Structures are given as structure tokens and as C-alpha cells.
């Protein structure tokens, strides 16, 4: 499947420009491992900058998360990759959805399935899928970029250290960051008023899923 510019344009017109951004909740996942290191460094003029990078990447840790204009929502860390069963458990147990919200996901296979839709609609919410290959329309991708930058600097070389760094990185995503990400992706206009009562973040810590 390729990027469809018509679908992207239709999304901007029917969702990004029409839907109240306070109704939108983006759900996605990102991966990290113990080999993450900084990509850039400063050095004296004429000198190369060096750093050590582990040869062993270690087992991947997947972070399932949601984000609204309020900030990061409930998050779940899973050792290894996720499957549909894990994703359905996250949707059922973790997100603090409110009736009337619209849950937005990309087209990853694990995000699709009738059970996922049922769980969301049971809470009085609607489910929408982004146009294919459109990370630029997904504000949580920008949050993940900031989180990965923090993880690279943290250089957690054990799973415990990586998880701890993930918690700090999630804490660093403020409601103001979230609103900036929404604005950059076209869902929020500069100066657009938001209800003050919704400005408190729903993030309440990182939940770990045991093997």
C-alpha cells in the first residue's frame, strides 16, 4: 500500500480542520533497546567526537501509549514486540477514555480487529484510522521522537535502567508539548482556546507487563 494524497487531503478537511482537537486521542507504540546512544556530540575544533555503543542491542522493549491535548495518557511497557492480544489488553485496561472521544491509530496490523473496535465503542468512543504512511498526521510520533532523544542521552544499558529512563522521558512530555505537537500536525490552530479544565495530564506512571 502506498501513500494516498487524496486520502490525506480528505483527512485534513474532514478531521484535522473540523473535529474539536480535545476529542482526539492518538494511540501508538514505539520500540527501544539498551543500545540507544546519542547521535551527535560536541568536540574541540579539528577533533572528532567519540562515544561507545554496545554491540549487543538487547531485547526490544515496546512502549504502548496514548496522547491527547492534555498530554500523555496511560502507558504500558512490554518486553519484546506486541501482538494483537497484548494491544487489545492495553486498549481494554489502560486508556482513560471518556465518552465522545475519537481514538486515532495508524494501520499497523495489531491495531486492527473487531475486538479493538468493540472495546473502544463500548466506552462511547469512535475509532478512526489514519491514511496509510502518514506519520506527519500523528502527533504522538513527535512525542516519541522527544522520548527517544531523552532515552539516547540516558544510555540505559539494562532493561531496568531503560524502563526507568522511559518513565522520566514520559514525565518530560508536558501538556504544552502535546498541544505543540497537535498544532504542528494541523489539529490545533495558533491561539485556539482550550477548556482549562482539560489541561491536566492523564499520565499516571508507566505500567510494566511481565513476560
Question: What residue ranges belong to the model's regions?
Answer:
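Short functional hotspots at interaction and active-site rims
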Residues: 1-211
Amino acid at each position: 500500500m502506498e501513500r494516498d494524497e487524496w486520502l490525506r487531503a480528505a483527512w485534513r478537511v474532514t478531521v484535522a480542520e473540523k473535529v474539536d482537537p480535545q476529542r482526539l486521542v492518538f494511540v501508538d507504540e514505539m520500540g527501544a533497546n539498551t543500545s540507544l546512544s546519542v547521535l551527535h556530540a560536541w568536540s574541540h575544533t579539528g577533533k572528532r567526537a567519540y562515544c561507545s555503543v554496545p554491540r549487543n542491542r538487547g531485547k526490544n522493549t515496546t512502549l504502548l501509549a496514548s496522547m491527547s491535548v492534555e498530554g500523555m495518557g496511560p502507558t504500558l511497557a512490554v518486553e519484546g514486540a506486541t501482538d494483537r492480544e497484548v494491544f487489545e489488553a492495553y486498549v481494554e485496561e489502560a486508556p482513560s477514555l471518556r465518552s465522545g472521544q475519537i481514538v486515532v491509530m495508524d494501520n499497523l496490523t495489531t491495531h486492527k480487529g473487531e475486538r479493538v473496535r468493540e472495546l473502544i465503542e463500548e466506552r462511547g468512543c469512535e475509532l478512526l484510522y489514519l491514511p496509510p504512511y502518514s506519520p506527519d498526521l500523528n502527533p504522538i510520533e513527535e512525542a516519541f521522537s522527544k522520548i527517544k532523544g531523552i532515552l539516547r542521552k540516558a544510555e540505559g544499558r539494562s532493561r531496568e535502567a531503560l524502563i526507568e529512563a522511559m518513565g522520566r522521558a514520559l514525565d518530560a512530555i508536558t501538556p504544552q508539548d502535546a498541544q505543540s505537537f497537535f498544532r504542528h500536525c494541523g489539529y490545533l490552530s495558533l491561539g485556539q482556546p482550550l477548556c482549562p479544565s482539560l489541561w491536566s495530564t492523564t499520565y499516571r506512571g508507566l505500567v510494566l507487563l511481565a513476560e
